[in-house]
UniProtKB/Swiss-Prot annotation:
Membrane topology: Peripheral membrane protein
Family annotation (SUPFAM superfamilies): C-terminal domain of alpha and beta subunits of F1 ATP synthase, N-terminal domain of alpha and beta subunits of F1 ATP synthase, P-loop containing nucleoside triphosphate hydrolases
Binding sites annotated in the UniProt record for ATP: G164, G165, A166, G167, M168, G169, K170, T171
Similarity section: Belongs to the ATPase alpha/beta chains family.
Principal localisation: membrane
Underlying gene: atpD
Official protein name in the record: ATP synthase subunit beta
Pfam families in alphabetical order: ATP-synt_ab, ATP-synt_ab_N, ATP-synt_VA_C
HAMAP family: ATP_synth_beta_bact
UniProt subunit comment: F-type ATPases have 2 components, CF(1) - the catalytic core - and CF(0) - the membrane proton channel. CF(1) has five subunits: alpha(3), beta(3), gamma(1), delta(1), epsilon(1). CF(0) has four main subunits: a(1), b(1), b'(1) and c(9-12).
Cross-referenced Gene3D superfamilies: 2.40.10.170, Bovine Mitochondrial F1-atpase, Atp Synthase Beta Chain, Chain D, domain 3, P-loop containing nucleotide triphosphate hydrolases
Annotated function: Produces ATP from ADP in the presence of a proton gradient across the membrane. The catalytic sites are hosted primarily by the beta subunits.
Amino acid sequence: MAAAAKATSGTKGVVRQVIGPVLDVEFPAGKLPRIYNALRIEGKNTAGQNIALTAEVQQLLGDHRIRAVAMSGTDGLVRGMEAVDTGAPISVPVGEGTLGRIMNVLGEPVDEQGPVKTDATAPIHRSAPKLTDLETKPKVFETGIKVIDLLAPYRQGGKVGLFGGAGMGKTVLIQELINNIAKEHGGVSVFGGVGERTREGNDLYEEFKDSGVINADDLSKSKVALCYGQMNEPPGARMRVGLSALTMAEHFRDVNKQDVLLFVDNIFRFVQAGSEVSALLGRMPSAVGYQPTLGTDVGELQERITSTLEGSITSIQAVYVPADDLTDPAPATTFAHLDATTVLSRGLASKGIYPAVDPLDSTSTMLQPAVVGDEHYKTARAVQSTLQRYKELQDIIAILGLDELSEDDRLTVDRARKVEKFLSQPFFVAEIFTGMPGQYVKLDETIKGFQMILSGELDDLPEAAFYLVGNIDQVKAKAEKIRSEAKG
């Protein structure tokens, strides 16, 4: 296969048709490029301006013609221009040199920091790891964030759906996860910006620099690589940038043998771009106008995100649900691959409970006794049932007041409010805003803390002592401080 690819490398074709981002190219007989090969088109347009673009072969049309999708704008492209077959798929830079950098779908830097300092590159199209190479035993990925580790734990090498609207703290949660995997697991992160707003991509980069996730003075100390294909890019770039980011993550897993976090924002835009390309290629649309290959496209991306015996890629994917319709084929296909969901709640955010992760709506396939153990499972279910009872009582409290509740219900409400407050915690990346030192809470400390609240051991402590702290020792210290201030 490699020999065949080399045989077509350098073969020159001629652009015969341009329809938006799709171009037809004619090659000499017997020298057609393979599907997914990259074509390079360079030259001058009619205005005398230089053009340089890369396109990916998608279809073999017959009559020595292929159809390709451009990875950048085709403005000024004219029929008769020369297209050169590179003989290989699009390849992107990989390794430590990518950390702290922003790259596009082709791995070219777009942050005005000079070239990416790495010699290693890897093709964006490759097979998922073999079954014999996979780590099949489920293992919890500890994040140090209490609400996630207790109620909706992440699977190492799993996929997590992140649901939340604007202003709920998605970005801060992502930054904290990047910080914690670097400090506690010695891992790195890759962020794939797929089809989202350019302004948001820029804001995220600036926030990463402010919080120390990207070290602007010494990029080698950065903890994340960024790969962007934003809303203004052609559909080809938005369709492939997720694979570019995944390829960078695979290098850290397979070569450096590290645990990697891969963020995809937004997985729906990946599907949307595939739908646009499918229509441009003339394929018959499927349900709701999506591409007929929807399941295959999503599966090829998701199956590469996994744990191997060498390392793991744990993926957190922001999921946009069009018109809040969970039965739409795009989110429905994505859900089939998810191991956990983290749902952010506007109600909790408005109460000042951060991270605003909804303890009742967030789910995980890992939360079962056989995986997390009986103690963890029972504690998590007890926390959820207490919060559920509190939710049911809120209407009664709003109409009649707290005094009309039975003694047992009042105790439940008191403990539930403490549990709700204890689910908050200060983040390392938010220290510059809150003035509070960040806290990484080990899972056993988290379980112990919630057990003590539910058993009634801490009924005499004030509710305020449970807000924005790490473990129970800090709750007791804060309660002591509140009491001494009240006496003083």
